[in-house]
Amino acid sequence: MLKKDMNIADYDPELFKAIQNETLRQEEHIELIASENYTSPRVMEAQGSQLTNKYAEGYPGKRYYGGCEYVDVVETLAIERAKELFGATYANVQPHSGSQANSAVYMALLKPGDTVLGMNLAHGGHLTHGSPVNFSGKLYNIIPYGIDESGKIDYDEMERLAVEHKPKMMIGGFSAYSGIVDWAKMREIADKIGAYLFVDMAHVAGLIAAGVYPNPVPHAHVVTSTTHKTLAGPRGGVILSAADDEDLYKKLNSAVFPGGQGGPLMHVIAGKAVAFKEALEPEFKVYQQQVVNNAKAMVEVFLERGYKIVSGGTSNHLMLVDLIGRDLTGKEADAALGSANITVNKNSVPNDPRSPFVTSGVRIGTPAITRRGFKEAESKELTGWICDILDDASNPAVIERVKGQVLALCARFPVYG
């Protein structure tokens, strides 16, 4: 029999210890992975609710199982809030992840073998934008576009490739690009060749919701996003459109269910509904502006200390530190910073001579530190410590000193105060 007082601590101490250790790690480490964030206790409450028990194949009002009257309310709340947040006329909140949302778009709009123009992974794109190791690169004919010598997206090259190869779909969006994307220009190019414009805004969705980064929804035929990252919601995906095309909406819905998924995760959809409501609050706009301010503050210190930033700066939440020419790989930098309780990720940079498992760069993002309450002063101080380690990565005394400083800073800014 099930009882309300059942808990993990008493039943499964090994698992409980791992959860405790992860909780402590999050409190005592500074999180700078650009795709990570801290979700609110309200989102976690929704994810831990009885909604996890309910199967709900189909869509609100059109389910294959009975007993869905209340989960219909939950999903409808999430849909309507997502539409309001991004100015969309269509939203599907069922994708289990951003990659599955992207997969559904491919399935809805293309046939295997169709030509797709997507951002080169080595220049800041994402696996699902055409990497040879991903379904997108295996099933479709991918033509990659990239950045110019200044580190900015090369729209002239994009247009030339589009006219030459006539892709059926163009993809905008990125996983490691610190600039502003000209969505209107991309739509202009897509219209010139009669292609779909699909934008994956996963990394900047929170900034877009807050109005501090341009919104692709008015320009693209279809937009996808994760619901974590800058949106600070549960791990999951969403598909949006403002195309006012019911046939397109039906294709997208069918591509999610039954095309790629079975039953939706109703407890996660409830978490999405909470996160979308939080993102509609005025304080969310303040938070997102601070995310950008903190990123700019970090770039300022990196440049002062002689470090190269791809594209020379940032206009969003992330930056890519280029270590080419230094006696330090991205992998080594990642490990050295990790020893001081600073979590980043190694990342390839444009024209990287090293393998993706070693790399010549690190990617850094500010959503999580800003969520803790860091402002420009803390961001600059932290960047100075990072540079101290990168300057002398094999010196254990420097790492130990910075670790102590990190622990003190974390104690001042608890994740869940």
UniProtKB/Swiss-Prot annotation:
Keywords: Amino-acid biosynthesis, Cytoplasm, One-carbon metabolism, Pyridoxal phosphate, Transferase
Name of one Pfam family that matches: SHMT
Class of the enzyme per the UniProt entry, highest EC level: transferase
Keyword Cytoplasm attributed: yes
Site (Plays an important role in substrate specificity): residue numbering on this chain: H228
Cofactor(s) of this protein: pyridoxal 5'-phosphate
Catalytic reaction annotation: (6R)-5,10-methylene-5,6,7,8-tetrahydrofolate + glycine + H2O = (6S)-5,6,7,8-tetrahydrofolate + L-serine
The protein's Enzyme Commission number: 2.1.2.1
Main location: cytoplasm
Pathway(s) annotated for this protein in UniProt: One-carbon metabolism; tetrahydrofolate interconversion; Amino-acid biosynthesis; glycine biosynthesis; glycine from L-serine: step 1/1
Compartments where located: Cytoplasm
Biological process per Gene Ontology, one example term: glycine biosynthetic process from serine
Record: residues binding (6S)-5,6,7,8-tetrahydrofolate: L121, G125, H126, L127, S355, P356, F357
UniProt xrefs under InterPro entries: PyrdxlP-dep_Trfase, PyrdxlP-dep_Trfase_major, PyrdxlP-dep_Trfase_small, Ser_HO-MeTrfase, Ser_HO-MeTrfase-like, Ser_HO-MeTrfase_PLP_BS, SHMT-like_dom
UniProt keyword Transferase present: yes
Record GO cellular component, one term: cytosol
PANTHER family: SERINE HYDROXYMETHYLTRANSFERASE (PTHR11680:SF50)
Its job: Catalyzes the reversible interconversion of serine and glycine with tetrahydrofolate (THF) serving as the one-carbon carrier. This reaction serves as the major source of one-carbon groups required for the biosynthesis of purines, thymidylate, methionine, and other important biomolecules. Also exhibits THF-independent aldolase activity toward beta-hydroxyamino acids, producing glycine and aldehydes, via a retro-aldol mechanism.
Family: Belongs to the SHMT family.
Oligomeric form and interacting partners: Homodimer.
Protein name: Serine hydroxymethyltransferase
Gene: glyA
